[in-house]
Amino acid sequence: MHRNELDIFNPHGIDLIENDEGFYQLAVINHSPFESIEMFEIIKTESSWDMIWRGCIRVPDQYYFNDVALKKDGSFYASHMYKRDISMEEWLMNSLFKSISGHVVLWSDNNFNKVDGTDGSGPNGILLDESSGLLYVNYNQGDNLSVYDINQNTKTGSYFIQSPDNIFLKGGSVWLTSLDLQANDFGDCAEKTNCSLPFSIHKLNQKTLKREDKFSFSRTVFGLPTIAVPHDEKIFMGSFHSDRIGYFSEE
């Protein structure tokens, strides 16, 4: 579908791959001015990397997506968190009782279809390792990471972790963020520029989901992390409530 060049984006989860045609494809979950998944091509120029908008897919009314995981053939998975008009009271009840609120969907042949067996509480970050046929799904309100074999349509493993958000895979390790608190612990922290409530970064073995390392923090200049990305012996972190990117040394 077409867009007005003056439209304002409200981006959420993203994924970047090199597709079957040899292009770098970026998918972006977008919430404004309508629910959509935006597609971009990333190209290298002489002095920088540029983004070219290639189109978007309108999201049906029954879905409210958080994150996306691209396949090399152009299809993709997306995490449907919960209904769009969820109230704060309903959201808190889901968090407390871990109620089923959403699932993963697969977009293929211009259709969205539910992936059976992926129901859970607050599906959030997702990551596809297409080479192994494994789909990793974080259930933010359900406090767990689940792994699914997309070829056999089976769940192969899970890992308990509080309020996980996005997932990053590198060098045979899975990196996750954890909020070491409950939903009613926020108090007035959400009103501050940076909220330094306790959190942890978990490093797991990709095959076994055994924890390889854990880094815990409290009362720092950074908080409420959403992603942990290792690079050059540092772990870089994004946040859903901060005016900065944080990092720490893995040592």
Regions found by a protein language model. Name each.
Residues 2-18, 53, 58-76, 82, ...:
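Beta-rich, blade/repeat-based domains predominating
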Residues 25-27, 75-77, 134-137, 174-176, ...:
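Conserved beta-propeller blade signature
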Residues 28-29, 78-99, 177-196, 247:
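Short, conserved, GDST-rich strand-edge loop motifs in beta-rich repeat architectures
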Residues 32, 43, 82, 141, ...:
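Residue-level signature of beta-propeller blades and closely related beta-rich strand-turn architectures
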Residues 34-40, 101, 144-146, 186, ...:
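Structural motif
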Residues 42-46, 107-111, 149-153, 205-209, ...:
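Short loop/turn segments that connect beta-strands within beta-propeller blades
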Residues 161-215:
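Loop/turn-rich, solvent-exposed surfaces of beta-rich toroidal or solenoidal domains
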Residues 224-251:
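Blade-level signature of beta-propeller repeat domains, shared across WD40, Kelch, NHL, RCC1
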